[in-house]
């Protein structure tokens, strides 16, 4: 979209990815490679690089998180509902004033009980909807066929990036065995990202939401436990 309409008014963004892959987790290693391919192409593009950047932070660990969490304005907690063990990273971002783009999964559910819809940017299926859709039959190919934006993303994975690496294997996995229903949640995620960007442009509202997140995070503090 940036390349097609470079003059559009957009909130500049930097996406920071911090992750590790277990030695035998081949798909996770491919996703990390994909992030780096994206970063190489986007960050070198004279049209995109002033509006969008991608950074992969190697060897993600506690000492790195201690710098990252206070500096972040947005926390992406996007696991498929019903799939994520309840962690605490999202709460640490909340305590530092970052606003959450996320699903109702894991500890996001507990945060949502304190914040409500109005202080988070929620998207995606709920856990019971995931179960029902799987039972009734989920066909990601149909979503690919009817969603132009989604189709462009999948086709880009197949075509590859400026470093010459193609991710046809990941594209096929999404189309044939989308275990985490990523394609189902795609349009909802894009809408949440747009709501987040629109809110960020209204600085007073954004700052108010950030302060509410900080104020209501006290229940998650280690001191209370």
Regions found by a protein language model. Name each.
Residues 1-65:
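Long, K/E/R/D-enriched contiguous segments that form extended
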Residues 3-7, 17-19, 204, 210-212, ...:
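Histidine-centered catalytic/metal-binding microenvironments
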Residues 25, 62, 83-84, 223:
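Loop/helix-junction capping segments adjacent to catalytic residues or to phosphate/diphosphate-binding pockets
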Residues 29-33, 88, 224:
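Generic recognition of short, well-ordered alpha-helical segments
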Residues 55, 76-77:
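Short catalytic-loop micro-motif centered on adjacent basic/acidic residues
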Residues 70-72, 78-220:
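Catalytic binding pocket for nucleotide-activated donors in carbohydrate/polymer assembly enzymes
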């Amino acid at each position: 979209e940036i390349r097609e309409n470079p003059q559009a008014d957009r909130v500049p963004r930097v996406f920071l990815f911090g992750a590790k892959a277990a030695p035998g987790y081949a798909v996770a290693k491919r996703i990390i490679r994909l992030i780096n391919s994206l970063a190489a192409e986007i960050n070198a593009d004279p049209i995109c690089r002033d509006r969008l950047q991608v950074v992969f932070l190697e060897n993600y660990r506690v000492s790195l998180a201690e710098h990252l969490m206070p500096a972040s304005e947005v926390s992406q907690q996007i696991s498929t509902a019903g799939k994520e063990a309840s962690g605490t990273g999202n709460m640490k971002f909340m305590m530092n004033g970052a606003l959450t783009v996320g699903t109702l999964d894991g500890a996001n559910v507990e945060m949502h009980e304190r914040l409500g819809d109005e202080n988070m940017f929620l998207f995606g299926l709920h856990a019971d909807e995931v179960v029902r859709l799987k039972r009734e039959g989920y066909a990601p190919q149909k979503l690919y066929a009817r969603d132009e934006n989604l189709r462009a993303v999948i086709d880009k994975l197949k075509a590859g990036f400026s470093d010459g690496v193609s991710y046809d294997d990941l594209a096929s996995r999404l189309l044939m065995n989308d275990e985490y229903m990523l394609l189902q949640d795609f349009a909802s995620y894009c809408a949440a990202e747009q709501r987040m960007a629109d809110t960020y442009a209204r600085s007073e509202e954004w700052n108010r939401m950030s302060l509410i997140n900080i104020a209501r995070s006290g229940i998650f503090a280690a001191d209370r436990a």
